[in-house]
Amino acid sequence: MLPNSILKKIYICNQKEKIISRSFLLKLFKSQIGYPKSLAQLNSALSSIMRWYSHKGYQWALIQMHYIEGSSSIIVNIDEGLISTIRTEYYTSSLERSSKSSYTNMIEKHLSIRIGHPINIIYLKRKINYLKKNKLVGNIIYSVERSRNNSSHLDLKFQIQELQDKELVLFGENLYKTSYVIAFLSHLLQEPLYLANSWETYNIDQMSANRFKLHYYQPICNYQYINNKELADILIYLFSKSTFQHIKNSRFNPLLNCDGETTSRCKLYLRNLSNASSYFTVSMHSLENTINLKLRYLNPSLRISKKFTIQVVIQIIKKIASSCIFPSSIFLKNQKIFGQKFTNQYIFEGLMTYNITSCFSMSEKIFLSRNVQTKYFVKNLQTVKFISTTKALIGSNDHWLKKQSKLLYRQFLVLWLKLYYQNFDTLKWPTKGHLLEIESCYFTPFQESTFLNYHSQFHYNNLFFHKINIQHITHFSLPFYFQSRINYILRNVLKVQSNLKMETLPILLCRAYFEDKVCKPFFNFSIRIRTEYQVPINNKSRISFFCNYIRPFLKNSYQTCIIFQSSLINQKFISSLYQKLFYGLEIQLKLPINQIPPLSIEYTINSGRKFCIYLYISHQQ
């Protein structure tokens, strides 16, 4: 080969069948045609091709180059690593696998591998992790080798651990409530008391054919009165001189005893790749007078990538409970002469969520993440009132029970819609983007409902709750740079964040228990502005000086009825609580693990010279 020979032609074997684009190859070799051959430029072009294949996941690609026609032409042959043979071995085989060949074909389909096509290691690992994460297989071990007959082809070997096509998971829960007791005492003592709940949960998971896992969880929270003897003494003292003194102490047993509910559930996971490419979960929730059926369906074919998921959850609940919503009916619970009616409650809840994440480049790398959630909730509650004899006896006991008898049944409908959209990710440094959240709730009683006091002349047939929250974050880079000995450049950033929030909230005000009531809707529109000046210390931490300003615009609806003076809250006082100016210092640390969001420690002083310290981790998903 003469050193000054002119390169006339470059042939790419079967270029149309290759994965690499033709424009990319022309960009590499077009500038070399018509000029003396340069080994350095040719090696650089071949290295660029290998890097392209390696970056895309085709690490087993090979490139061969030959000279023809007196060294004036070059033939480039790209072997992309085609699959020659696929061998699959199974262990802990499933008993219900009808055909080994059909099961193998389904595995190859899920892994997106076929004989005669190149292998992509990145996609292969992603598909294997997906099958393992969704418990479609136990484990997959693979190996890739050059074929003995042709070194440009590949032989694949898989070792697959199968799971049983059916897996049973058992759940159990015990829930104890004293809400009736605390609510009754709260009305009598005229002071707020906390609820007392005890919740025990135990799960038995069948992880495999001979492996079980037991979970036990028992939280106890919000106990105010836990001494039953003290509680009984208080009740006896309160009713010792009342019209209830003729009732025996045994009648208080339903009131003193905690309400207990026991739940046993069973989940059945169906996984059978040889018959279907999807699986679903059925959850049966059963307790006293309650039936709950929940169906969850996930189709793996809908999961296009790791960042795109569609799930559909449908839940139907039928609940039959006693109509003892108010404390008075608890006393009459065990009396046989009173007729006892029940409540039928049907709840249908549908939830569809999907997450779309995309990445594009526009002079700099910008990560665009979208989270959209739409949830609709329809609830219908029907409570049948007591029979006439019961109401007559209740009315003859006490004055406040007379008014309570007017509120023994409610019928209403609630519709709730929530939309959420955001395109910023706090893992990026710095954070920028905007957030939009819209929530709307419509509440309406039925025509025969006595939602408000029967004697009140002001009656509202419907209630609305509407909220819009818009958040925008912008960063401005200031022309200030400095360079340290380790040769990295830091930049000060001025961050401006604004929030627009609008709410329409109905508030039910009352002067005393079961006395003057009125519904007062408020329209609240607030603006929040945050200005933050960030000074970087290094590439993992920074100090921020910030100033927050909040201004609400609180208004009453023109349709608001007359409010009793004893129930009113000073609006000037409410407004003064919101009109505050905050300023302070913040230290933000970016942890070396990308999956963990930045950690912030904030020292804040408001306009009233009151200070506080915040420690928080925030991340939008």
Swiss-Prot record:
Keyword Chloroplast tagged: yes
One GO term describing the cellular component: chloroplast
Domain of life: Eukaryota
Compartments, record wording: Plastid, Chloroplast
Keywords for this protein: Chloroplast, Plastid
Name of this protein: Uncharacterized protein ORF621
